[in-house]
């Protein structure tokens, strides 16, 4: 936001008018990852589409300001990022790889040891199949793929923790627009 890293949920729409805003979608070209986003995928730090786009923005901003940041500068830049899916070492590797690729786009670094030559994926450094979508903040979760004609389950719980049900009339619920099926204790399939 106007050259500063800001948590988007702390802004209101009126503040955004005529502002310079960079989002994860603005980092790369159409269907192409930016240098930092690609380094994140290659290192294997991408685990969640929630924090990773923010991390890509923060690291891009850091590398725009400081060509080869120290660990202290990296720690300071990432201090506002709460990530439980990855360790800091991987972010240091992302920055090391991105800095190296500024001069040599084919540069690689030792990321992690590999094990078991007889296996192709297990014990190998292998990026997540949806990592590129995640780091670009593109739809990649089941919730992102809900079709317009999908059924949504709604649960109505009893206000009583323990109760003996003697009668249950679901006719009003069944008459509601859009209701496909009402399941109760009387017609619930036994699956075990």
Regions found by a protein language model. Name each.
Residues 1-112, 121:
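Signature of N-terminal electron-transfer/Fe-S-associated modules in redox systems
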Residues 99-192:
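Flexible, low-hydrophobicity surface segments
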């Amino acid at each position: 936001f106007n050259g500063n890293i800001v948590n988007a949920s702390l802004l209101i729409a009126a503040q955004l008018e005529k502002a310079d805003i960079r989002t994860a979608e603005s980092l790369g070209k159409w269907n192409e990852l930016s240098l930092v986003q690609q380094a994140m995928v290659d290192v294997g730090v991408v685990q969640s589409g929630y924090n990773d786009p923010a991390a890509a923005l923060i690291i891009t901003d850091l590398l725009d300001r400081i060509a080869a940041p120290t660990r202290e500068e990296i720690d300071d830049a990432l201090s506002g990022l709460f990530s439980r899916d990855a360790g800091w070492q991987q972010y240091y590797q992302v920055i090391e790889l991105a800095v190296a690729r500024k001069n040599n786009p084919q540069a690689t670094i030792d990321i992690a040891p590999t094990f078991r030559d007889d296996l192709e994926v297990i014990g190998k450094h292998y990026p997540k199949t949806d990592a590129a979508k995640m780091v670009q903040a593109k739809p990649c979760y089941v919730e992102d793929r809900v079709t317009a004609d999908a059924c949504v389950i709604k649960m109505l719980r009893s206000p009583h923790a323990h109760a003996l049900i003697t009668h249950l009339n679901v006719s009003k619920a069944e008459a509601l627009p859009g209701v496909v099926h009402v399941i109760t204790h009387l017609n619930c399939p036994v699956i075990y």
